[in-house]
Amino acid sequence: PTVAYAQEESTESTENTDTLTPDKKPATTITKQINEDVYQVLDFDDTQEEEFAKKGFITAPDSLQITDDDGNVVWNMDNYDFVRDADSPDSANPSLWRNTKSNTNYGLFQVSDDIYQVRGYDLSNMTFVRTDNGWIIMDCLASSDTAKAALELFKSEMGDIHIVAVIISHAHIDHYGGIQGVLTQDELADSSLSLDEQIASGKTAIIVPDGFENAVMSENVFAGTAM
């Protein structure tokens, strides 16, 4: 099949490229065929992934538009209505389209006992873990505006919380960029203390992987534009 596709593609290489414009164009015949073939490979009657995506749902606003202090929209899930309200077009892989639909489920979810997530408020999820000493936040989204909104949603159901620590899993911006949306400088624990001492101080420890600062700098220099 790969050879057949390649041969057919060569005869259609100019099918939709006669005029290079930003306007939407129909899928080529080969693209349609490849995407249609996905229906023969995967069981689209299996809705388990959709059920998983909705499992544990607690609450969400009817519409999700997050703005900054100046009223500028920084995150708008309404922009993805075209995915939720339509079947996969012939220009898209139907499995990826279905996966994208699942990703439009936003709000507060319970993952398991004492573990919650705010989903769809940014590129990544914000996870809350209840401990004996307070709450741990795992990853704090890409911007302070989205992180603040996610924390407010969580508090609307769980009440005011003491954040004992923020864990940043890795050096991509959507996992650390929103730190100022969940913490102020005055709330930070003294990083020169041991972790136990930071927790005992009543302030919030920030826990990152070894080499985090170097990874942040190097990844943004080499891959920041592409990402």
Regions found by a protein language model. Name each.
Residues 8, 18-30, 179-222:
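Internal hydrophobic scaffold segments of catalytic domains
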Residues 31, 96-104, 151, 212-227:
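Charged, low-complexity, helix-prone segments enriched in Lys/Glu/Asp/Gln
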Residues 70-90, 202, 210-227:
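Acidic/polar short surface loop at catalytic or gating sites that assists cofactor/ion binding
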